[in-house]
């Protein structure tokens, strides 16, 4: 019997960067290519470790892009405020930026792909962004801005989240991340 509380969070791992041209927003038919496990004495630390295990390592620049569908705008405010409190600069497309600004978030407006530079793609391709939060409106249409934003983010090594609950979980885990955490790659541990 274990007397200490232990939290374990299993997280799927997807290899979207290997699937050139594929939509990265998840549907019910999507299968993960692996999984990782974050184990810790509290939920937030286990969550952070699971994100690290899944390959999401932040921050580098503390700059992010948010472009969310209308039905996610209300929830996006809380997520944006969490990232803002963590020191992130938030760039957002016109309607998302306006909504965030109207609700107290210091979001910087950035042009859509089809508009003049600087635009969303300039930030992504210029390797000036750590994270993209883009919730799809229709998905799978390769001509739409959202698809191009998500695809280019993945192909240039920028982490891209497509749901507000995952974005909120990442912010929560980053709020509690610290240098005192012990990270162990179990693949390197002998005698397990």
Residue ranges: model-predicted function:
Residues 3-161, 167-172, 179-180, 184-192:
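ATP-dependent carboxylate/acyl-activation modules
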């Amino acid at each position: 019997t274990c007397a200490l509380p232990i939290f374990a969070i299993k997280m799927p791992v997807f290899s979207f960067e290997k699937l050139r041209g594929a939509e990265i927003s998840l549907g019910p038919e999507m299968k993960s290519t692996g999984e990782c496990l974050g184990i810790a004495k509290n939920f937030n630390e286990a969550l952070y470790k699971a994100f690290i295990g899944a390959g999401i390592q932040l921050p580098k620049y503390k700059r992010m892009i948010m472009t969310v569908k209308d039905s996610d705008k209300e929830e996006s405010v809380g997520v944006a405020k969490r990232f803002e409190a963590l020191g992130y600069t938030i760039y957002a497309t016109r309607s998302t930026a306006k909504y965030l600004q109207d609700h107290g978030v210091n979001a910087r407006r950035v042009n859509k792909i089809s508009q003049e530079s600087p635009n969303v793609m300039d930030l992504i391709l210029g390797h000036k962004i750590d994270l993209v939060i883009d919730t799809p409106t229709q998905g799978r249409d390769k001509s739409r801005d959202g698809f191009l934003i998500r695809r280019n983010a993945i192909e240039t090594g920028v982490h891209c989240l497509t749901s507000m609950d995952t974005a909120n979980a990442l912010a929560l885990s980053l709020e509690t991340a610290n240098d005192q955490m012990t990270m162990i790659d179990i693949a390197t541990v002998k005698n397990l």
